[in-house]
UniProtKB/Swiss-Prot annotation:
Subunit structure comment from the entry: Homodimer.
The organism's taxonomic lineage, starting at the top: Bacteria, Bacillati, Actinomycetota, Actinomycetes, Mycobacteriales
Enzyme Commission code: 6.1.1.23
Assigned keywords, A-Z: Aminoacyl-tRNA synthetase, ATP-binding, Cytoplasm, Ligase, Nucleotide-binding, Protein biosynthesis
Name by which UniProt lists this protein: Aspartate--tRNA(Asp/Asn) ligase
Length: 591
């Protein structure tokens, strides 16, 4: 070893010892003929002092981020010079030798000062020398170990599944890989290990897990990555309760790493209730502000805007004092979300209603409105009217925006909830509008994925009452973030083919795309279910950072670009030729 001790391990009890340290020059200070450096390695920082004339002469060349090895004597710092801010603050190392292991060019940014994200990602290897980014990556390693410990204790088998496979429709676009030895054909990078983990259940593995890399060629979104990680699990001979129980045990182990005990059992809410009360299928329960159903209240209204299939409201405490400019800003905020605007009523301190909507209401409506929605004098009532789904979504977004503007969210709080019993299907147009890829050509597509089982008792309604079929599925939400989603799977070929048919995949197309899975279901497939946790999002929450990029060693930007390697990049003509990427497949001959 080039060093005898880790820099952050030295204490006053080590005084008098000769040590050798290796690391980076975090800071250099010159004081009256003596040079001090803060020597940093992965364990922490130790102050090194250069007094010996020969070593001092060498130390004059040191600059920030030089990589060095230093030998010397551990000494107690002079009285008054201790630094209680660092663990090694009682001691310093009086250097007797110095070796420069690697010089550093002038830094593109100072490691102890803020820097732009693109610059940080371009020089990510420097960014990771900083305390916070390094701590996030190290915590991620502990998170992996904690999850594995729980799963190993429950006899799960860690199994790797293929990362180049067949392109199968799963709700997003595939990344395609040309198959050089089969010109005109392509592999796909997996969007998830979904099909393989189900096949492992057919294979009798019974309990599988994997910390899996997944790939989705999605449109650019602010906090998405084209490659991401999930903790993937599957279990045979289980129901939803079994999967939820072990999931809660894993989550408890993860949050214990940061000293938080998750209250168990984690509460549950149905998808329908979540949408009705919070306007979101991933509600943030750190604050109240529930939506109020107003359709019945306005059933006889003469106000045309409220003559709609759904009318709902959310109350902004103290919002009546907002200036007109701010209220106009809410209209722009709503329009950016695809709405025409955000109707509002102001409740005056005397209880009188104001604002443009109030004058369109009947006397009875004005008299009863504040009581119906729970508004007090000085509050602002925001409304949405129209089809229920987009109207609730708008109010749900307004609810979150109100909470942020009023500081109602405790940043130290944790609020977990299971969202259960979602619909099995949604209109394909809704999925497309949300940026997903509808599987099949039918009017309906799967809310989760095509392999989710209907809730027991709903099998007969798949074709006849498609929109009201519930899924045997469960999502775990933390602080308004979906951090995991799972379901009991279809394990019968006949039901799987019926689900495919509703989604517009006829038997021939289903066999062409998923024939291997359908065939596997004919060989005694067991009932099975599982869950996948969004590993990047969970790590971001545990590290208390806003972006998942902070917990990925080498992330892409929001635009899918890697500033470090400048990927993606064009390939050469030779590579195009060798890969067969431009080969047009022969048209298939009729039989």
């Amino acid at each position: 070893m080039l060093r005898s001790h880790a820099a952050g391990s030295l204490r006053s009890s080590d005084a008098g010892q000769q040590v050798t340290l290796a690391g980076w020059v975090a800071r250099r200070r010159d004081h009256g003929g003596v040079i001090f450096i803060d020597l940093r390695d992965a364990s922490g920082i130790t102050q090194v002092v250069f007094r010996d004339p020969d070593v001092l002469k060498q130390a004059h060349r040191l600059r920030a981020e030089f990589c060095v090895a230093v030998a010397g004597l551990v000494e107690i710092r002079p009285e008054g010079n201790a630094n209680p801010e660092i663990a090694t603050g009682d001691i310093e190392v009086n250097a007797s030798s110095l070796t420069v292991l690697g010089e550093s060019a002038p830094l593109p940014f100072q490691l102890d000062e803020p820097a732009g994200e693109e610059l940080r990602l371009k020089y990510r290897y420097l960014d990771l020398r900083r305390d916070a980014p390094a701590a996030a990556i190290r915590l991620r390693s502990k998170v992996n170990a904690a999850a594995r410990e729980v799963l190993d204790r429950h006899d799960f088998v860690e199994i790797e599944t293929p990362t180049i496979t067949r392109s199968t429709p799963e709700g997003a676009r595939d990344f395609l890989v040309p198959a050089r030895l089969h010109p005109g054909s392509f592999y796909a990078l997996p969007q998830s290990p979904q099909l393989f983990k189900q096949l492992l259940m057919v294979a009798g593995m019974e309990r599988y897990y994997q910390i899996a890399r997944c790939y989705r060629d999605e449109d650019f979104r602010a906090d998405r990555q084209p490659e991401f990680t999930q903790l993937d699990m599957e279990m045979s001979f289980v129901d939803a309760e079994d999967v939820i129980a072990i999931s809660e045990e894993i989550l408890a182990a993860l949050w214990a790493l940061i000293g938080y005990e998750i209250p168990r059992p984690i509460p549950r809410i149905s998808y329908a209730d979540a949408m009705a009360r919070y306007g979101s299928d991933k509600p943030d329960l750190r604050f109240g502000l529930e939506l109020v159903e107003c359709s019945e209240f306005f059933k006889d209204t003469t106000f045309r805007v409220f003559q709609a299939p759904y009318v709902g409201a959310v109350v902004m405490p103290g919002g009546a004092s907002q200036p007109r400019r701010t209220l106009d800003g809410w209209q722009e905020w709503a329009k950016q979300r695809g709405a025409k605007g955000l109707a509002y009523v102001l409740v005056g301190e005397d209880g009188e209603l104001g604002g443009p909507v109030a004058k369109n209401l009947s006397e009875a409506e004005r008299a009863g409105l504040a009581g119906h929605v729970g508004a007090a004098p000085g509050d602002c009532i925001f409304f949405a009217a129209g089809p229920a789904k987009p109207s609730r979504a708008l109010l749900g977004a307004a609810r979150s925006e109100i909470a942020h503007r009023l500081g109602l969210i405790d940043p130290q709080a944790w609020a977990f909830v299971w969202v259960v019993d979602p619909p099995l299907f949604e209109p394909a147009d809704d999925a497309t509008a949300a940026g997903d890829v509808a599987v099949g050509s039918g009017a309906w597509t799967a809310v989760h994925h095509a392999f989710t089982a209907p809730k027991p008792g709903y099998e007969d309604a798949i074709e006849t009452d498609t929109g009201n079929v519930l899924a045997d599925a469960y999502d775990i939400v933390c602080n308004g973030n979906e951090i995991g989603g799972g379901s009991i799977r279809i394990h019968r070929r006949d039901i799987q083919e019926r689900v495919f048919a509703v989604m517009g995949l006829d038997n021939a197309e289903a066999r062409e795309k998923f024939g291997f899975l359908l065939e596997a279901f004919t060989f005694g497939a067991p009932p099975h279910g599982g869950i996948a946790f969004g590993w990047d999002r969970i790590n971001a929450l545990l590290s208390r950072v806003d972006s998942i990029r902070e917990v990925i060693a080498f992330p892409k930007t929001g635009g899918g670009v890697d500033p470090l390697t400048d990927a993606p990049a064009p390939i050469t003509e030779q590579q195009r030729k060798e890969s067969g990427i431009d080969v047009k497949p022969e048209p298939s001959k009729p039989h």
